[in-house]
Amino acid sequence: YFMKKIAVIGTGGTGYTVAAELSLRGFEVWLCDATPVEAEAAYIEQNVEVKLTGAMEGTATVRAVTNDPKAALADTQLVICCTISNLDEQTARFIAPHLYPGSAVLISAGNLGALIYHRVFQELGVKDPIVGDTCGNLFSCRRLGDRVAFAGNGYSPKKVAAFPVRDTGKLVKAFEGIYELIPASSLLETTFNAPNLLSHISLTIVNAGAIENAKEPYYIFKQGICRSTLNLADGMWAEKKKVMDALGLPCAPSPSGNHRKYADPTVHQFDHFKNLIGPDSMSSRYITEDIPILGCFFLSMAKALGVETPLYAA
């Protein structure tokens, strides 16, 4: 039976995976394409079957797939935004006119998106919104086709922070029974401890030649890990640790520990994760999203703190 209506914004891999997984658990999910269109181009497709594969399996019936934000956001105060961080302002403006007072907006994978959403919501007069970021994406996933999503992992509890941070408890409570969320101290903690700041950047740049010359689909977590990437990850992590220490924030462990497990043929815990396809070029979001939005902000913060980060700067 349907328990609560949840609006999921964004129809990429994360949007489809989140919508399918929630639907399998009995929630009424409206999945909304975040590309603005003219009113006459709006559509609503009801009871859409979405196949979920990989670490989570099942065929879900998503209540509706649409590009009409008014319909998607009707009669709900629970919103999960799953668009690329480069589109945060566009997405915030897309949903703002249709939000109910007191709506809770969870941004996956965060990346300081709550700052932008908060500013837009203030500008457009949204009443009492609760908006916050997850620390890393809700799922590592891909959209494989029109109605097929691949999950590299199941759900594990996520740290979250709202902006302003005094709303973090309200955000956790709003999604109680939907996701287990753990309060973080600030958006800086969730942003800098997200794995993409380090893993995507280090793995992709070192493997640029292999990615661009690949004749077959490339799997970076299966093919891209070697001694050099492990050393680079540890070096970048040491720089990150200095910045986190200067901020007085906890620092997540170096990803090299998990990367070593990915490279170990006797370890099968991460087999689905290693089957996440891509990237296929140097214009993938691993570069175009994670470097300008995460990497550059991290460098600015390090500079403001007087912490040297030569590897990140390079």
Task: List where the protein language model places each region.
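NAD(P)+-binding Rossmann beta1-loop-alpha1 motif at the extreme N-terminus of oxidoreductases
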Residues: 3-52
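Rossmann-like NAD(P)-binding element
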Residues: 56-99
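Rossmann-like NAD(P)(H) cofactor-binding subdomain of soluble oxidoreductases
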Residues: 85-147
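Predominantly flavin-linked oxidoreductase catalytic cores and closely associated redox partners
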Residues: 125, 129-183
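Active-site-lining helix/loop region of Rossmann-like oxidoreductase modules
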Residues: 158-254
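NAD(P)-dependent Rossmann-like dehydrogenase/reductase catalytic/cofactor-binding core
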Residues: 212, 230-314
